[in-house]
């Protein structure tokens, strides 16, 4: 405990008696736990739902190969106790969003330190700390970039005060009918995995979209196609999974359906190909006859890094067949009704997506990608740098010491940059902003306006897409402000299930209606004003109006913001939590560079816009939100899930 002896007496006592909650035991979490006990913090609780994977071992130093498959939180506790046996550590192998961890649970702690890897959990912890009145230290890293900030109720902005850029999405008809970029094919392949082996989702259909308006000369033709049934080639007669099951997941039949028959059907939509190069169907038998031709390449591909090699189309077909057989066996072992979950670190699942995506790229005349590239794009991977995690975890502890000293006004949002700014600083501290009076989370009376079509939005969509996904509620209850207190949604299981498939207009909800949404777990109430519109954009179900735009700021430093994660190699690392995991794991808005842009240029602009803080070279964040640094488009890092 060398550090605690260097602290002032009162602070040292506060350190030794305080109780902290660390949420996350991954890249930052491991470094943070080590720093905390070496500083003198001995009363710690750590929670993490994940288990240890081999890919974690290169930077999460509390774990060893023998720990693979075990709880991160439990092993982190055991490892820390080896060099600090006097520590009192409680480990939870669980999701922080579990209702057991309510406001009373959070009130046990002096402060909370986040080391998370998904936006939904960050939002939830933010709200729980606000409800409990407990200071929160938020953090994240992405490669060489990092960020730390402090959230304190009524004093600073909360995590949700500023809008976060939404994930990049693609129209369904582009994915299914007219892919033009490799990422379109990779998204399609991930959808295909779920349609065949996982949980089916109507929004992730992979068969040709026969109702694509672009494929018809007029809207009536699109409607006629959509209503077609029981005709030769009508791919909507049965679901993809039903058809695959009926064939016993025969790889060759699957191949010919997906890459020959469906492509031939697409070619019948001739209007799609008047200004595009038409796809070229593939047939298993023709590729199989060329199998010997690919042997030379396959042998040469063994040289160097295997995952960096781009396979030819025949090799991709063979990889597709092999992965289907392996995944089929995994399903059989799990039993009837079982489902698989796609994981970038599961070799058969990754092989399947790599093969299927590349075959589709070949069909649509795109350059095929290596397994490494596909994995990066499919998993939204940002290379992890262990030293970045170490620096950020150290900054978390320093901000925590300021809070314990009662010097919250000295707390800062600190950015770690890839290159020194014009002042030759890698660390750029900014003063904390006050709460946003328009924030729909921490405002005195949280209120928001949502534009939607009341005749199309169902109660289920309101609950899942708007309340849970957009506004990060866990178990919402919704009451219509109609003078009667009509209950639209109840968190009690089964109580309002009959409402789920009904349009909200059926309950008298119209333009200017108000809904009161409560989440008792989060101790959070949100008033929702309904703005009805008959003219919503295509593929847009709703839009948040006002200070929290659905698409985020006009020109945010999107790459740098969305890339900030918990230091894992995957900004969207799969979690077994039922919560919606977001691949664009965000923290508070940042003004540092994107990985591909010029850090010096951005910070030069910053210097001209911002004042110095007393006694230190810092940057005020009062104008931070107006800064619009140039951002280079990077289609290789895209949020998918």
From Swiss-Prot:
Subunit composition and interactions: Heterodimer of sae1 and uba2/sae2. The heterodimer corresponds to the two domains that are encoded on a single polypeptide chain in ubiquitin-activating enzyme E1. Interacts with ube2i.
UniProt pathway annotation: Protein modification; protein sumoylation
Function: The heterodimer acts as an E1 ligase for sumo1, sumo2, and sumo3. It mediates ATP-dependent activation of sumo proteins followed by formation of a thioester bond between a sumo protein and a conserved active site cysteine residue on uba2/sae2.
Taxonomic classification: Eukaryota, Metazoa, Chordata, Craniata, Vertebrata
Family statement drawn from the similarity comment of this UniProt entry: Belongs to the ubiquitin-activating E1 family.
Organism of origin: Xenopus tropicalis
Enzyme Commission number(s) of this protein: 2.3.2.-
Catalytic residues in the record: 173
Binding site for ATP: 24-29, 48, 56-59, 72, 95-96, 117-122
PTM text: Sumoylated with SUMO1 and SUMO2/3 and by UBC9. Sumoylation at Lys-236 inhibits enzymatic activity. Sumoylation at the C-terminal lysine cluster plays an essential role in nuclear trafficking.
Alphabetized UniProt keyword annotations: ATP-binding, Cytoplasm, Isopeptide bond, Metal-binding, Nucleotide-binding, Nucleus, Transferase, Ubl conjugation, Ubl conjugation pathway, Zinc
Single biological process term from Gene Ontology: protein sumoylation
Protein name listed in UniProt: SUMO-activating enzyme subunit 2
Cross-link (Glycyl lysine isopeptide (Lys-Gly) (interchain with G-Cter in SUMO1)) at residue(s): 236
């Amino acid at each position: 405990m060398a550090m605690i002896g260097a602290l002032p007496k009162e602070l040292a006592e506060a350190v030794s008696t305080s109780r902290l909650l660390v949420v996350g035991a991954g890249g930052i979490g491991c470094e943070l736990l080590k720093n905390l006990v070496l500083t003198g913090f001995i009363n710690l609780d750590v929670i993490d739902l994940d288990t240890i994977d081999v890919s974690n071992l290169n930077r999460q130093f509390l774990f060893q190969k023998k720990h693979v498959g075990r709880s991160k939180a439990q092993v982190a506790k055991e490892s820390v106790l080896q060099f600090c046996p006097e520590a009192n550590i409680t480990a939870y192998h669980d999701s922080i969003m579990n209702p057991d961890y309510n406001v009373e649970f959070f009130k046990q702690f002096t402060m909370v330190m986040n080391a998370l890897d998904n936006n939904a959990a960050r939002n939830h912890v933010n709200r729980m700390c606000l409800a409990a009145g407990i200071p929160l230290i938020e953090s994240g890293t992405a490669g060489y970039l990092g960020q730390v900030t402090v959230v304190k109720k009524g004093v600073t902005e909360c995590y949700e005060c500023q809008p976060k850029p939404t994930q990049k999405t693609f129209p369904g008809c582009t994915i299914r009918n007219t892919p033009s970029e490799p990422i379109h094919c990779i998204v399609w392949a991930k959808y295909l995995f779920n349609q065949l082996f996982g949980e089916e989702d109507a929004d992730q259909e992979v068969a040709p979209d026969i109702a694509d308006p672009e494929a018809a000369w007029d809207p009536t033709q699109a409607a006629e196609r959509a209503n077609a049934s029981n005709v030769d080639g009508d791919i909507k007669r049965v679901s993809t999974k039903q058809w695959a099951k009926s064939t016993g997941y025969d790889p060759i039949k699957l191949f010919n359906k997906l890459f020959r028959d469906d492509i031939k059907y697409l070619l019948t939509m001739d209007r799609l190909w008047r200004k595009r190069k038409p796809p070229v169907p593939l047939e298993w038998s023709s590729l199989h006859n060329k199998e010997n031709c690919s042997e030379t390449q396959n042998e040469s591909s063994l040289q160097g890094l295997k995952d960096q090699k781009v396979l030819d189309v025949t090799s991709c077909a063979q990889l597709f067949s092999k992965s289907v057989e392996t995944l089929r066996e995994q399903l059989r072992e799990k039993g009837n009704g079982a489902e698989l979950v796609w994981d970038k670190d599961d070799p058969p699942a990754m092989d399947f997506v790599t093969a299927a995506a590349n075959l589709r790229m070949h069909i649509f005349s795109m350059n095929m990608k290596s397994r490494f590239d596909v994995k990066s794009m499919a998993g939204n991977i940002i290379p992890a740098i262990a030293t970045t995690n170490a620096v950020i975890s150290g900054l978390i502890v320093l901000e925590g010491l300021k809070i314990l000293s009662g010097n919250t006004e000295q707390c800062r949002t600190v950015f770690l940059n890839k290159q020194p700014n014009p002042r030759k600083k890698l660390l750029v501290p900014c003063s904390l902003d006050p709460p946003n009076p328009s924030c729909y989370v921490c405002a005195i009376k949280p209120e928001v306006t949502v534009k939607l079509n009341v005749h199309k939005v169902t109660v289920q969509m309101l609950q899942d897409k708007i309340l849970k996904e957009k506004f990060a509620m866990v178990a919402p209850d919704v009451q219509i402000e109609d003078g009667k207190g009509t209950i639209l949604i109840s968190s009690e299981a089964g109580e309002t299930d009959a409402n789920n498939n009904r349009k909200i207009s059926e309950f008298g909800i119209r333009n200017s209606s108000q809904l009161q949404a409560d989440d008792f777990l989060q101790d959070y109430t949100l008033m929702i004003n309904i703005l009805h519109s008959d003219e919503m954009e295509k593929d847009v179900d709703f839009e948040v109006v006002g200070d929290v735009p659905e698409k985020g700021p006009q020109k945010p430093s999107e790459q740098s913001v969305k890339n900030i994660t918990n230091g894992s190699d995957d900004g969207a690392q799969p979690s077994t939590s039922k919560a919606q995991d977001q691949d664009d794991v965000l923290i508070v808005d940042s003004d540092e560079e994107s990985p591909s842009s010029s850090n010096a240029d951005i910070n030069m602009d910053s210097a001209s816009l911002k004042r110095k803080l007393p006694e230190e070279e810092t940057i005020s964040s009062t104008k931070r939100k107006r800064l619009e640094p140039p951002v280079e488009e990077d289609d290789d890092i895209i949020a998918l899930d």
